[in-house]
């Protein structure tokens, strides 16, 4: 079962879509958020969660202090329901804004006008490198200076290049999961 790990909604269980998703494990999410908290990289930020599925990554960020979270997945019913449940736990004086959009990620990125401080990108493992590169190219101009992109892929995925405006900081493997920490600029 997927759950919010910490923050105002800590330990709240989240529903997981039943259409063949691969939710990010608690272990990997804990590693992501420990690294982000060490950088003081959550509080007050604008966060984008692409291929959000259950919305666990974006909603974890909301629970830990992100000001605005956008969840994007072509099938958004589960993330929308989870967002409603998480927001019921939010402090009444300063709740985060959570927007859930049900549309293909590439279509969203091409039409997006906002910019973000932190982006989670967890596409299906069977997505090819061309799709990922298209997403990153469309995203690059929407990143704020110093923005962080956390890309989750299979640890067996071949190496790839990065578009102009995005550079690899590091890669860390957790079993079958590889996290690519990317930086804007």
Task: Outline where the language-model segments fall.
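Class I S-adenosyl-L-methionine-dependent methyltransferase catalytic core
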Residues: 1-185
């Amino acid at each position: 079962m997927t759950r919010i790990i910490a923050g105002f909604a800590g330990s709240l269980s989240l529903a997981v879509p039943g259409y063949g998703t691969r939710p990010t494990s608690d272990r990997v999410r804990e590693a992501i958020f420990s690294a982000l908290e060490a950088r003081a990289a959550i509080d007050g930020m604008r966060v984008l969660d692409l291929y959000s599925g259950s919305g666990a990554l974006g909603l974890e960020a909301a629970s830990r202090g992100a000001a605005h979270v956008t969840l994007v997945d072509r099938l958004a019913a589960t993330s929308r329901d989870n967002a409603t449940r998480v927001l019921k736990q939010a402090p009444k004086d300063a709740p985060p804004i959570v927007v859930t959009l049900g549309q293909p990620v590439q279509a969203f990125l091409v039409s997006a006008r906002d910019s973000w401080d932190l982006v989670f990108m967890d596409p299906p493992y069977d997505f090819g490198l061309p799709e990922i590169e298209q997403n990153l190219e469309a995203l690059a101009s929407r990143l704020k200076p110093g923005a962080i992109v956390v890309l989750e892929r299979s640890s067996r995925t071949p190496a790839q290049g990065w578009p102009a405006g995005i550079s690899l900081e590091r890669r860390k493997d957790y079993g079958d999961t590889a996290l690519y920490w990317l930086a804007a600029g």
